[in-house]
Amino acid sequence: MQQIPSIKKAKELGLYTITCDYLPENPGHKIADEYYNVSTTDKEAVLQLAQKLQIDGIVAYASDPAAPTAAYVAEKMGLPGNPYESVKILTEKDLFRDFLHKHGLNCPYAHGYTTYEEAYRDMENFHFPVMVKPVDSSGSKGVVKIYDKSELKAAVKEAISYSRSGRFIVEEFIQK
């Protein structure tokens, strides 16, 4: 629904619009010139499609998970866009927290992990409560607040269930 104004504006400007997504019922597909059933998180499949169609521009509207794919395709095809590595940093919570820390910017203590065991061994470095989050999800999906490490295993399972990469972060909870 949120993509509709952008698609309409592109068409007003005389641009040929092509949408792709794994959800064929998304309303933007109905007004685009073409639609392809390709997941916006599958960057290689979107790149292959973009090369086949010889596109000359790519954007991702109202979709955090699609932003890295759009940047990747633009970079690979020499199209205008944001640098892929920059977009990855902005959309993957562990990379973003590391970036903030490395550059001396305020942020809660956080660390990224791939396994429960790895995180469990590191819990002595955290002050509870903490938040457990998938690194690459949005809309608070898979986010769990825990009060001690006995709750970690269930929280990690929940976070990973929403992570495309299988990675998660643990970050200290900041009370306002």
Language model feature labels by segment:
Residues 40, 90, 113, 146-149:
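Conserved aromatic
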Residues 75-142:
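A conserved helix-loop-beta module that forms one wall/lid of the active-site cleft
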Residues 24, 136-138, 174-176:
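Glycine-rich beta-alpha junction loops
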Residues 58-61, 110-113, 173:
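Structural motif
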Residues 106-109, 125, 129-132, 144-176:
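Conserved ATP-binding module of the ATP-grasp superfamily
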Residues 45, 118-122, 151:
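Short acidic active-site motifs
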Residues 1-86, 117:
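ATP-binding N-terminal substructure of ATP-dependent carboxylate-amine bond-forming enzymes
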